[in-house]
């Protein structure tokens, strides 16, 4: 004798009944699961907790004042013009005079015609 607990045919029927109860029949091969609202309420509670944490972080940002200790004010151009993209000619007479050089100087290392005995 078998009881309803140990009867294999009874276990199959209860499993298929549970699947049928959790889905809505929409036709052949098209079924939609019934939403489990207990999981959604847990997600909502977590989102509310996350929002509280964000507010605390934003308050900290508001309290901090920006200091310009790292920025050298003398490096800021008063006209607001930018120096990027400006072509500089280092070979012009004006640039050489500013550096204290003349255009005829040669480096000793660059001479390739020097013979060594």
UniProtKB/Swiss-Prot annotation:
Coiled coil: none annotated. InterPro entries: Histone_chaperone_domain_CHZ. It holds the Pfam family CHZ. It is found in: Nucleus. The keyword Hydrolase does not apply. SMART domains: CHZ (SM01082). Residues 34-72, 106-117 have a biased composition (Acidic residues). Residues 86-96 have a biased composition (Basic and acidic residues). GO terms for cellular component: nucleus. The keyword Chaperone applies. Residues 1-16 have a biased composition (Polar residues). Keywords: Chaperone, Nucleus. Its main location: nucleus. Residues 1-117 are annotated as: Disordered. Forms a chaperone-bound H2A.Z-H2B complex that acts as a source for SWR1 complex-dependent H2A to H2A.Z histone replacement in chromatin. Belongs to the CHZ1 family. Forms a heterotrimer with H2A.Z-H2B, stabilizing the association of the histone dimer. Also, with a lower affinity, forms a heterotrimer with H2A-H2B. This is Histone H2A.Z-specific chaperone CHZ1. It comes from Coprinopsis cinerea (strain Okayama-7 / 130 / ATCC MYA-4618 / FGSC 9003). The gene is CHZ1.
